[in-house]
Amino acid sequence: SEYYTTENQIKAAVDGTYDGLDDLLSSDLEIATVHLFNLEYLVGTSYRPRAAGNEQNQFLLLSGLEESNGIIRNFWKATFFPLENCNSVIQNVSATDIISESQKAKYLGEAYFLRAYYYFQGVQLFGDIPLKTEPTVDLNTVKIPRSPKEDIYNQIVEDLKKAEQSGLDWSDKTGHVSMLSLIHI
């Protein structure tokens, strides 16, 4: 990649892997992943978590949701756009010699953790989802079939182990991934 040619570009790319957390934590996606709410939808005892808004952002029974629902489409994008960023960082930072080995390990640890986290959110919401661990280089390869949940969970565990072995700091005051993050997932 032409982008990963300076330390600042590499840091910016790593910071970009956190972009998906904004969608995950400041939108309806957090409601869908909170067991208190989503279990009510699964058993059909609740129609929506809020009293106002249009029909798309007032969750209907899960059995009545359609893929054209904008909220569902946003959930899907909030899973796969950040995964693409993580895959790009993992591939390009692994190949660079611009930064120190310790900094490279830290950045890779962050990207592996976040990829695991995004996959965890995705599999909780959708079940079987596409498993993609390399960045897109050819738009003809974008549409890939869903993989079994078991494969996704195996990838999550593998990524978390790599994050654990990366030498992340115990805690991080900047809000970046740390060893403490691994404990809490």
Regions found by a protein language model. Give the residues of each.
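Short acidic-aromatic linear motifs embedded in glycine-rich loops, typified by GG[WY][YF]DAGD(H)
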Residues: 1-110, 114-154, 169-175
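Amphipathic alpha-helical segments of tetratricopeptide repeats
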Residues: 164-165
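Aromatic- and glycine-enriched pocket-lining scaffold segments that form the walls
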Residues: 180
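Conserved small/polar residues in nucleotide/adenosyl-binding loops
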Residues: 183-185
